[in-house]
Curated annotation (Swiss-Prot):
Gene3D superfamilies, alphabetized: Enolase-like C-terminal domain, Enolase-like, N-terminal domain
Protein name: Enolase
Cofactor: Mg(2+)
EC number of the protein: 4.2.1.11
Catalytic activity from the UniProt record: (2R)-2-phosphoglycerate = phosphoenolpyruvate + H2O
Binding sites annotated in the UniProt record for Mg(2+): D244, E287, D313
Catalytic site positions: E209 (proton donor), K338 (proton acceptor)
Major localization listed first in the record, in broad terms: cytoplasm
Matches recorded under InterPro entries: Enolase, Enolase-like_C_sf, Enolase-like_N, Enolase_C, Enolase_CS, Enolase_N
Cell compartment(s), UniProt: Cytoplasm; Secreted; Cell surface
Organism, as annotated: Methanococcus maripaludis (strain DSM 14266 / JCM 13030 / NBRC 101832 / S2 / LL)
Role, per record: Catalyzes the reversible conversion of 2-phosphoglycerate (2-PG) into phosphoenolpyruvate (PEP). It is essential for the degradation of carbohydrates via glycolysis.
UniProt pathway: Carbohydrate degradation; glycolysis; pyruvate from D-glyceraldehyde 3-phosphate: step 4/5
Signal sequence interval, chain numbering: none
Length: 426
C-alpha cells in the first residue's frame, strides 16, 4: 500500500492579500514529501448567497483579521485530515463540510475550508510529480483560455462615477495564449496613453484589478475610450469587449429599479441599454446584467440579447442549486466560477460540470482581493474552461496567473487556444 500520499501535516497562517487585508494561507505536506500551499482570495462586490468568509470582527486590521479561520484549520481541520490520502479529494472536502455542518460554511469559514481543499490537491499533485492542471484534468486538459482583461474600472472597484464595474478586452483573434497576452498588454499600454491624453496623468492610476479608473461619467464614454485604445493598438479585428455590470451594486430594492447615471431605470429599460451597447460596440459577453435575485429578468435578458454570453456571477455564486434553477428557467447561459464563492475544489468542479452538461459556457475568475497564488490558472486549463478573467496585464497578483498560463502553454506543446470558440472550446 502506497502511503506516500497520506497527509502528514497541515498548517495555516494569516497573510495579506493585494488590498492589504488579511487572508488565509494553508500548507499541506504528505508523507512522501509532496507540498502544496494556497492563499485564498477575497471579493469587493460579493453575492449575498456566497459561502461565508470568516472574519474576526475585532480591533486588529479594522475587524478583518482571520485568526479564527486560521485556528479552525490548525486546531480542528488538521486533526481530522492527518493520515487521510490526499488523492481522495472528494472525501477530504466532505469531511470538512461535515465538520462545518452548515449550508454556507459559516462555522469553520469558507476561507479556512478552501485553503485546505486547494492545498491538499496541490500536495497530491506534487507527490505524484504532476503539474496541478494535469493532476485535476488528466490528459484531456489541453485548452488554453481566452483571457478577459479588466482594463477600465468602475463601480466597487473604482472611485469614479461609472456604474458598471468592469470593462474588459478579450483577444479572440489571437493564435495562442502567449499572443493573446501580448495583444492585451499592447492594448493596455495604448489605452494608458489615450486615458492620459484625455484625462491627465493622474487618471492612469490603477484600481484593485490593475485597470484604469479615469473620471469618465457615462458608460458610452468608457466604451468609446476603450475602443480608441484598441484601435490605436491595431487590434480592432482581434479584440472584442466583455462587461461586468455587477448590477446588484446599483439596484434599489425599494423601488425595484436601477440607478444609472443618477436616474432610476427599469429592468426593461436596462435591457434596452444593453441592446444599444451591443449594437454599437463589439461586446460579446455581459456578466451580472441584472439584480442577483432576478432570475426572471435574467431569462428575459438571455432571450432578448441573442448571441450574447450572459454570465451569472452573483446570480449563481458557483452554487449548483442556484445554477440548476437558472438552467431550468433559461436564466443566463454562462457560469462564472469563483472557487471562494463555494469553498471547496470538489464543489467547484461539480458546478463546472453541471454548466457544461447543460450547454452553459464557463469563465474561471479571480477576485479583486488576490495574491501571488496562481491556482486558478491551472484550474482553468484543467477544466478546459475556455475563458479566464483575472484582471489587467498589470499588478503582480494578476500577472502571476497570466505568467503561469504561459508556462502551461509552453509545457503542453500540443494545446488549443480557445479564441473565437471561447463558449464551447472543446
Amino acid at each position: 500500500m502506497d502511503d506516500s500520499f497520506d497527509i502528514y501535516e497541515i498548517k495555516a497562517r494569516q497573510v495579506l492579500d493585494s488590498r492589504g487585508n488579511p487572508t488565509v494561507e494553508a500548507e499541506v505536506l504528505t508523507a512522501g514529501g509532496g507540498y502544496g500551499h494556497t492563499i485564498v482570495p477575497s471579493g469587493a462586490s460579493t453575492g449575498t448567497f456566497e459561502a461565508v468568509e470568516l472574519r474576526d470582527k475585532k480591533e486588529k486590521y479594522g475587524g478583518k483579521s482571520v485568526l479564527n479561520a486560521v485556528s479552525n484549520v490548525n486546531d480542528i481541520i488538521a486533526q481530522e485530515l492527518i493520515g487521510e490520502d490526499a488523492r481522495n479529494q472528494r472525501l477530504i472536502d466532505q469531511i470538512m463540510l461535515n465538520l462545518d455542518g452548515t449550508e454556507n460554511k459559516g462555522n469553520l469559514g469558507a476561507n479556512a475550508i478552501l485553503a485546505v481543499s486547494l492545498a491538499v490537491a496541490k500536495a497530491a499533485a506534487d507527490t505524484a510529480s504532476l503539474p496541478l492542471y494535469k493532476y485535476i484534468g488528466g490528459s484531456n486538459a489541453y485548452v488554453m483560455p481566452a483571457p478577459m482583461m479588466n482594463v477600465l474600472n468602475g463601480g466597487q472597484h473604482a472611485g469614479n462615477a461609472l456604474d458598471f464595474q468592469e470593462f474588459m478586452i478579450m483577444p479572440v483573434g489571437a493564435d495562442s495564449f502567449a499572443e493573446a497576452v501580448r495583444m492585451c498588454s499592447e492594448t493596455y499600454q495604448s489605452l494608458k496613453k489615450v486615458v492620459a491624453e484625455k484625462y491627465g496623468k493622474d487618471a492612469v492610476n490603477v484600481g484593485d484589478e490593475g485597470g484604469f479608473a479615469p473620471p469618465v461619467k457615462t458608460i458610452d464614454e468608457a466604451l468609446a475610450v476603450l475602443l480608441e485604445g484598441v484601435k490605436k493598438a491595431g487590434y480592432e479585428d482581434e479584440i472584442v469587449f466583455t462587461i461586468d455590470s455587477a448590477a446588484s451594486e446599483f439596484y434599489d430594492e425599494k423601488s425595484g429599479s436601477y440607478m444609472i447615471a443618477g436616474e432610476k431605470v427599469s429592468t426593461d429599460k436596462l435591457i434596452d441599454i444593453y441592446k444599444e451597447m451591443v449594437e454599437q460596440y463589439p461586446i460579446v459577453s455581459i456578466e451580472d446584467p441584472l439584480f442577483e435575485e432576478d432570475f426572471e429578468g435574467f431569462k428575459t435578458a438571455t432571450k432578448e440579447l441573442k448571441g450574447i454570453q450572459i454570465v451569472g456571477d452573483d446570480l449563481f455564486v458557483t452554487n449548483t442549486k442556484r445554477l440548476k434553477k437558472g438552467i431550468e428557467m433559461g436564466a443566463a447561459n454562462s457560469l462564472l466560477l469563483k472557487v471562494n464563492q463555494i469553498g471547496t475544489l470538489s464543489e467547484s468542479i461539480d458546478a463546472a460540470n453541471m454548466a457544461f452538461r447543460n450547454g452553459y459556457s464557463l469563465v474561471v475568475s479571480h477576485r479583486s482581493g488576490e495574491s501571488e497564488d496562481s491556482t486558478i490558472a491551472d484550474l482553468a486549463v484543467a477544466l478546459n474552461a475556455g475563458q479566464i478573467k483575472t484582471g489587467a496585464p498589470a499588478r503582480g497578483e494578476r500577472t502571476a496567473k497570466y505568467n503561469q498560463l504561459m508556462r502551461i502553454e509552453e509545457e503542453l506543446q500540443i494545446s488549443k487556444y480557445a479564441g473565437k470558440d471561447f463558449k464551447i472550446p472543446f
